[in-house]
Amino acid sequence: MTAGFHVIGDAAVSVVVAAFERAVDDFGIAAVARCGHRREHVEMVTADQAAKLGAWGIIASVQPNFDALWGGSNGMYARRLGIYRGSRLNNFALLASQGVPLAFGSDAPVTGLDPWVSVRAAANHRTPGSAVSMRAAFAAATRGGWRAAGVRDGVTGTLTPGAPASYAVWDIGERDVFAPRDAIQRWSTDPRSRLPALPRLGLTDALLRCRQTVHRGAVIYG
């Protein structure tokens, strides 16, 4: 059975990590990881906690637009918690570096539903060093959500032969290929490289417009 936890502040994170630690002691890491447990928000996490959660396969269901709206040295987080603590919230890079699976969402109606807003916010984090790459953000906004929902067939959330035909068609402008190494990035516009181009989503770039939405082969919009 999969359990989900609404976890925001440092006290809540500490309680949940301690509970998982006891579960791991009783049942072992493999049994805990197999369940695909998740935490919603998990905004305040330390490096030690992130390492444990990554080792245990605990998914982080997070909302990047929280940082876009309230992060930074002069945002709501800093005003209420101080710059030191406020700048350490929503550290997606820390979570990813420790192997914590990420799933991006909006927490609507708290923030808007547009998934590209979340992708842009995660790749342009207001705290230096807390961002993830565009490709990692895209994966968290697509496959990550399915994984958090318990779907682990390896194809759902991708555009590959045999995957469910669930996708959206977007109007986009400039595209970039985001890859781990520059040498790959220079030649990998070929679809066979399996590194397709993604929209350019800097802070001043226009957001995308959805033209069509398809769910399991049925057109539901456009």
What are these regions (language model features)?
Residues 1-89, 103:
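Active-site core of metal-dependent hydrolases
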